[in-house]
């Protein structure tokens, strides 16, 4: 059965694994992105991940899902937010294909999530679907007739930068903002909590977490509307 190295580069963590052609994973792992160290550091992490996989498996291809605007033809990051310094211009596809001589495809992470939902998830069977992701930032993607709608300049769905209440959608409603808010309310180190922690505490009745989530949901409602 064919196997592919699949790597998702997010602003907070890099999730990676070996995906088989029956859409099941042989293995899955996760590591911190350390985004503030910049694009070169991330590319080195990706190279090392593929190198380790290549020693264990015969890889048919490399699939990269990444934060930032991506030229899906060249596999280059054409724009990245300040969350990942010096990531713009990173030639992921070219670098990996040259390093490993294995076909590589690179796409925006939200577009990848939308494709997954469209073909095997909640939007399966639909002709047109919209996927909104809420993580370190906020993004969306549009699928029309089984293909990602990229728009004239490749930026269709980049709703995170939408102006809202004197700021941007993602600077008000992303999960990273939720974490910062709860950390400040509880006077704890931001490194000690994450979104999962906050929602679990809210289920147990934590008033600070409930209040912060309510405020986040209000922002998301405004933005989606």
Segments (PLM) and residue ranges:
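A short acidic/small-residue loop/turn micro-motif
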Residues: 33-34, 85, 155-158
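Two-metal-ion RNase H-like nuclease active-site motif
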Residues: 2-8, 129-132
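Glycine-rich beta-strand-to-loop/alpha-helix junction loops that act as flexible
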Residues: 62-68, 136, 224
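Conserved phosphate-binding loops in N-terminal lobes of ATP-dependent enzymes
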Residues: 5-66
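Short hydrophobic alpha-helix segments
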Residues: 29-31, 81, 152
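Glycine/GP-enriched mid-protein hinge/lid loop-to-helix segment characteristic of carbohydrate kinases
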Residues: 17-19, 23, 27, 38-39, ...
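Phosphate/ATP-binding catalytic cores across multiple sugar-kinase/actin-like superfamilies
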Residues: 215-225
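Glycine-rich phosphate-binding loop and adjoining helix at the ATP-binding site
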Residues: 35, 39-47, 61-62, 69-128
């Amino acid at each position: 059965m064919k196997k592919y190295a699949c790597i998702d580069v997010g602003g907070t963590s890099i999730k990676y694994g070996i995906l088989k052609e029956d859409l099941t994973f042989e293995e899955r792992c996760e590591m911190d992105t350390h985004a503030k160290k910049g694009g070169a550091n991330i590319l080195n992490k990706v190279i090392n991940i593929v190198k380790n996989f290549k020693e264990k498996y015969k890889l048919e291809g490399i699939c990269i899902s990444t934060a930032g605007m991506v030229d899906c033809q060249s596999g280059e990051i054409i724009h990245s937010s300040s969350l990942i310094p010096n990531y713009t211009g990173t030639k992921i596809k070219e670098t990996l294909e040259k390093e490993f001589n294995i076909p590589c495809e690179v796409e925006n992470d939200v577009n990848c999530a939308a494709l997954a939902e469209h073909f095997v998830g909640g939007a399966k069977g639909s002709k047109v679907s919209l996927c909104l992701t809420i993580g370190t930032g906020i993004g969306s993607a549009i699928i029309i007739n089984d293909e990602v709608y990229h728009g004239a300049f490749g930026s269709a769905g980049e709703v995170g930068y939408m102006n809202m209440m004197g700021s941007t959608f993602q600077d008000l409603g992303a999960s990273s903002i939720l974490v910062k808010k709860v950390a400040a309310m509880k006077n704890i180190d931001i490194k000690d909590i994450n979104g999962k922690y906050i929602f679990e505490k809210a289920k147990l009745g934590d008033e600070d977490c409930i209040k912060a989530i309510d405020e986040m949901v209000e922002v998301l409602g405004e933005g989606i509307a």
